[in-house]
Regions:
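A solvent-exposed, acidic/Ser-Thr-rich amphipathic alpha-helical stretch
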Residues: 21-75
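Phosphate-binding glycine-rich loops and adjacent basic patches that engage nucleotide phosphates
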Residues: 8-18, 42, 59-63, 82-85
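A beta-strand edge to alpha-helix "cap/lid" segment located at domain peripheries
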Residues: 4, 53-131
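Helix N-cap and loop-to-helix transition residues
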Residues: 4, 20, 43-44, 116
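Short, low-complexity N-terminal intrinsically disordered segments enriched in polar/charged residues
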Residues: 1-30, 127-131
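Hydrophobic pocket/interface hotspot
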Residues: 9-12, 24-25, 32, 44, ...
Length: 131
């Protein structure tokens, strides 16, 4: 039986909380893209890994909280607070994302995330994430 979008989302959030980059990346393939709108998307495994890797590596804890969600066919709309703990300090960012899935393969194919990256980068500059 085909996997449901909500099951992919829950498994993906679990992988993030385990901070296991191989497990996180197993949800994507070469067709996948993740866009922090309005910035250009990260396309394919390598680019998406480059996006996730620094923050996952720096964080001692990761927790993405879903505030509200809607599911239809192969899509999910997720209002979230993405929370990262770096050197004992919590950094959180509010996001609204549209996720599209390849249900037979259980993959995340596209993400369009709407987030104020300016504010996020300002906060993270304090954590020296770009070292």
């Amino acid at each position: 039986s085909m996997v449901k979008p909500v099951e992919i989302v829950e498994s993906f959030l679990q992988a993030l909380s385990e901070r296991e980059i191989g497990l996180i990346m197993s949800f994507f393939d070469e067709r996948s893209s993740w866009q922090n709108v309005p910035h250009p998307p990260s396309n394919g495994i390598q680019e998406i890994e480059l996006m996730f890797s620094p923050i996952i590596r720096k964080s001692s804890k990761v927790q993405w909280d879903i505030l509200s969600s809607a599911y239809a066919e192969n899509r999910a709309w997720l209002e979230r607070v993405d929370r990262f703990w770096i050197a004992g300090i919590e950094y959180s960012v509010q996001c609204n994302g549209v996720f599209e899935f390849d249900l037979p393969r259980g993959k995340i194919i596209t993400v369009r995330d709407y987030v104020d990256l300016g504010e996020w980068r300002e906060r993270l500059a304090l954590a020296q994430l770009n070292d």
